[in-house]
């Protein structure tokens, strides 16, 4: 089960996401569903069907868990290959 405390250790593909803040104002506010993830990027399918590739390190993301909880994550914390990030140890707040 994905919770705000363990979202780093789970797959992000399929989650709803919105770009809350970004260095690039053009992508701020974009929302959709994560369809792919690489070491440095998230590929987001927007509501109109278009896909956009967003660098993780330049944005703050709002993810919605399957239970409906909203989680804010600084993209710099996500920069890693998904399989490495899932194994990585994170300090609990």
From Swiss-Prot:
Its EC number is 3.1.26.5. Its main location: cytoplasm. InterPro entries: RNase_P/MRP_Rpp29_sf, RNP1, Rof/RNase_P-like, Rpp29/RNP1. The keyword DNA-binding does not apply. It catalyses: Endonucleolytic cleavage of RNA, removing 5'-extranucleotides from tRNA precursor. One of its GO terms (biological process) is tRNA 5'-leader removal. It is found in: Cytoplasm. It is an enzyme of class 3 (hydrolase). GO terms for cellular component: cytoplasm; ribonuclease P complex. Pfam families: RNase_P-MRP_p29 (PF01868). Keywords: Cytoplasm, Endonuclease, Hydrolase, Nuclease, tRNA processing. GO terms for molecular function: ribonuclease P activity; RNA binding. NCBIfam families: RNaseP1Mthb. Belongs to the eukaryotic/archaeal RNase P protein component 1 family. Part of ribonuclease P, a protein complex that generates mature tRNA molecules by cleaving their 5'-ends. This is Ribonuclease P protein component 1. It comes from Methanothermobacter thermautotrophicus (strain ATCC 29096 / DSM 1053 / JCM 10044 / NBRC 100330 / Delta H) (Methanobacterium thermoautotrophicum). The lineage of its organism: Archaea, Methanobacteriati, Methanobacteriota, Methanomada group, Methanobacteria.
């Amino acid at each position: 089960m994905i919770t705000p405390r363990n979202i780093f250790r789970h797959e992000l593909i399929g989650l709803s996401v919105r770009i809350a803040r970004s260095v690039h104002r053009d992508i701020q506010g974009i929302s959709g569903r994560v369809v792919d993830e690489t070491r440095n990027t998230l590929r987001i399918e927007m509501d109109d069907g278009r896909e956009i590739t967003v660098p993780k390190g330049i944005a703050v993301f709002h993810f919605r868990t399957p239970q409906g909880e909203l989680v804010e994550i600084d993209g710099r914390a996500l920069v890693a290959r998904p399989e490495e990030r899932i194994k990585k140890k994170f300090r609990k707040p």
